[in-house]
Amino acid sequence: MEKGTFQIKTGFAEMFKGGVIMDVTTPEQAVIAEEAGAVAVMALERVPADIRAQGGVARMSDPKIIKEIMAAVSIPVMAKVRIGHFVEAMILEAIGVDFIDESEVLTPADEEHHIDKWKFKVPFVCGARNLGEALRRIAEGAAMIRTKGEAGTGNVVEAVRHARTMWKEIRYVQSLREDELMAYAKEIGAPFELVKWVHDHGRLPVVNFAAGGIATPADAALMMHLGMDGVFVGSGIFKSGDPRKRARAIVRAVAHYNDPEVLAEVSEDLGEPMVGINLDQLKEEERLAKRGW
């Protein structure tokens, strides 16, 4: 991507619509993801379930691991940086990743400021729990939004909450008179121009994917029914009993989310799903979705 204009960045993200992006930690996993039909992979040293289990500070992955994954597949490769850590983003841009995820899954580097994403040619995806968060990230230059969900839990409830909240707030914006939009923009802390765009178009100005806790084909199809453009699957595939089969099943579930017969077929005989976490058991400081603002 020679030109880093916003239209080119958002156009690139549009190409992922209707697809599945999978977390991978090795070139072998990346090949499994590509063969299963993933539209892109997210290169990581540890999947969110392991980051959650091991604790400590989670940082950008070793560039060597990311480069090995990039060499193994022909589909786009994404990688994560800490919230606010623009130097990690500079490193990823230098090694040629296709997309950067400024991610709450990693330990935030800055608790007040997100990265100024306009300064980069490479496009960014960011998490959001509601319309205000989404529009702030887009104002900073994000070319793609995803729900935050609660990564590494295998529990889809937070992703569902964030998706429903986003659409509820979009519908509310549409119900406002034009002379009420400025006050609402102030209330949610988002630029007026973006609030007006949402009012006029009834959706976000960029692609919006589901992420965080998606573990089964049914979970993935549920998020598509809730109006998402596609799905990120993290720990749910390679922490399960039969990753190859589950990866293929989730890709088919997203493509055929409206066909219960296909969903029933792809949900059969997938082996053990990842062990999930009931969110009631999480301490407040263990919740990743509240990172960022």
Curated annotation (Swiss-Prot):
Molecular-function annotations in GO = pyridoxal 5'-phosphate synthase (glutamine hydrolysing) activity
- The residue range of the signal peptide is none
Q: Which GO terms describe its biological process?
A: amino acid metabolic process; pyridoxal phosphate biosynthetic process; pyridoxine biosynthetic process
User: What InterPro entries does this protein's entry cite?
Assistant: Aldolase_TIM, PdxS/SNZ, PdxS/SNZ_N, RibuloseP-bd_barrel
List the Pfam families: SOR_SNZ
- What residues form the catalytic site here? 80 (schiff-base intermediate with d-ribose 5-phosphate)
Q: Might you give the EC number(s) for this enzyme?
A: 4.3.3.6
Q: What class of enzyme is it?
A: lyase
Binding positions for D-glyceraldehyde 3-phosphate per the UniProt entry: 164
Kindly indicate whether the keyword Iron belongs to this entry. Answer: no
**Function noted in UniProt:** Catalyzes the formation of pyridoxal 5'-phosphate from ribose 5-phosphate (RBP), glyceraldehyde 3-phosphate (G3P) and ammonia. The ammonia is provided by the PdxT subunit. Can also use ribulose 5-phosphate and dihydroxyacetone phosphate as substrates, resulting from enzyme-catalyzed isomerization of RBP and G3P, respectively.
Tell me the protein family, please: Belongs to the PdxS/SNZ family.
What's the name of the protein?
Answer: Pyridoxal 5'-phosphate synthase subunit PdxS
The species this protein belongs to is: Thermus thermophilus (strain ATCC 27634 / DSM 579 / HB8)
